[in-house]
Amino acid sequence: MGKRDRTEDDEVVTKKVKLDKKDKKEKKEKKDKKDKKDKKDKKDKKDKKEKKEKKEKKEKKEEVSDEEEVAEEKPKMTYTASANTIKSSGEYTQCDDLTNVSQSTIDNYFKEHTITIEGEQMRPTMEFSHVTLDPRITKVLTKFPRPTPIQAVSWPYLLAGKDMVGVAETGSGKTFTFAVPALEHVLSTSGGKGVRVLVVSPTRELAMQIYDNIKELCDVVGLHAVCVYGGVPKEQQRSDLKRASFVIATPGRLCDLIDEGSCDLSKVSYLVLDEADRMLEKGFEEDIKKIIGSTRPTGRQTVMFSATWPPEVRKLAEGFMKTPTKVMIGERDELAANKRITQSVEVLDPRAKEGRLLDLLRQYANDDFKILIFALYKKEATRVENTLTRRGYGVAAIHGDLSQQQRTKALDEFKKGEKNILLATDVAARGLDIPNVKLVINLTFPLTVEDYVHRIGRTGRAGKTGQAITLFTEHEKHLSGALINVLRGADQPVPDELLKFGGHTKKKEHGAYGAFFKDVDMTKKAKKITFD
């Protein structure tokens, strides 16, 4: 090897050494840079955590401050056995008249009306003399003989500012149950201008009905109420909201007004969810959560009413109510029909339904006899309405194809007796308080037995008796077992023709679909399935 070759080798080695040194240096710099970055990230994370903890501590402090402010605004309720006076401070105590009622009388009242209370026990205000309200409100109530069971049991809790869940049949006087304490709440506390009471309802018709009842009370005490629902222009509603203390609303329209900044609910301290189970059925859960989130987070009294008490309603209540008292009138955990309603089911050929309907109308229709007919589909309702009108019957109709103005007019005509027959789809099946409906006719059976119970609940309201006639065909035979259960549960006769479709059902639960019924032939043995 020559000198030149050795020199080249040395240069290569030297170059390699330099490259190695450079690589090591770059790696070291890279490592140092990474360590520095990790150290910075760690510090930032720590600072962020400390900042978050500081913020939470501050918010907690503000929350306590808010609660103290609310406590000053509305002192803590007290419960004694000496008086039932609603004082200007918002205090509730039990009156002497109620204290003097014997315990056996109270026990008999609970037994007679199948009343169950989960939570603190308070005596029911069975007579108007058992509760002292604003004289102007008392004057409105004098047109009624006495509080209904749900009112008698609920008023002590609601007047005391407690959260409450009420589970009772439709037509039990729920509106005044929450409206009377709501008025006392507003009158006895200082909250300034703005919406103080919010009632959320699943349908336009029910919202308007609640509004009509509440407006009567608001007018006598000088408070302003507004009804907010879809299907009509927003302009008037926006204007009315500016001076409203009470808002009765459907979820969809209310959320629209919240989004556009036309409805401020930050001062709402009395919140009512009426027909909570129906709102969940209609898919309003997210809207409800949004609405609740728009009200004041502390110092809010929350009231929920539901015709049934399924798991999804319980879960909703647990999410935003503070240890509510649960009041149940009747056996409500399982689907049950009002026992004051005489139910009869006729099994017939689908083509014979309209002929049978005409027979029933010839038998029952007169000027003093209000009849509510339920159809399943809008087109069916329109066709039957035209048929009955041609036959000379005075028929009003409400269904989804009609405008809000047309539906309101139809309901008014029926309520006032201008027309004695109301034809409806299930839009009117829940919550509507139509006085003195003597007969409900199910021309077409609904999609669920739950809807059947709510349909027939339009009669037999407020302690009165009623009648329901259902035309049942083989198209609905998959619901026969569940219907039989309802009939038997209400001590009603079950026709042999219905039993032929199948007399037993098993109630199943599915995570996605909820509770449903499956037809089962109990005479057959279960099949054993094996897999290879």
UniProtKB/Swiss-Prot annotation:
Residue span(s) of domain Helicase C-terminal: 356-502
Subcellular location: Nucleus, Nucleolus
Gene Ontology molecular functions: ATP binding; ATP hydrolysis activity; mRNA binding; RNA helicase activity
UniProt short sequence motif Q motif, positions renumbered to this chain: 126-152
GO cellular component entries: nucleolus
Keyword Hydrolase appears in the UniProt entry: yes
Gene3D superfamilies: P-loop containing nucleotide triphosphate hydrolases
Entry-linked Pfam families: DEAD, Helicase_C
Main location: nucleus
Enzyme Commission designation: 3.6.4.13
Region (Disordered): 1-78
Stored InterPro entries: DEAD/DEAH_box_helicase_dom (IPR011545), Helicase_ATP-bd (IPR014001), Helicase_C-like (IPR001650), P-loop_NTPase (IPR027417), RNA-helicase_DEAD-box_CS (IPR000629), RNA_helicase_DEAD_Q_motif (IPR014014)
UniProt entry tagged with the keyword Transcription regulation: no
Keywords: ATP-binding, Helicase, Hydrolase, Nucleotide-binding, Nucleus, Ribosome biogenesis, RNA-binding, rRNA processing
PANTHER family the record matches: ATP-DEPENDENT RNA HELICASE DBP3 (PTHR47958)
Family: Belongs to the DEAD box helicase family. DDX5/DBP2 subfamily.
Domain free text: The Q motif is unique to and characteristic of the DEAD box family of RNA helicases and controls ATP binding and hydrolysis.
Name of the protein this chain belongs to: ATP-dependent RNA helicase DBP3
Organism encoding this protein: Yarrowia lipolytica (strain CLIB 122 / E 150)
Organism lineage: Eukaryota, Fungi, Dikarya, Ascomycota, Saccharomycotina
Gene: DBP3
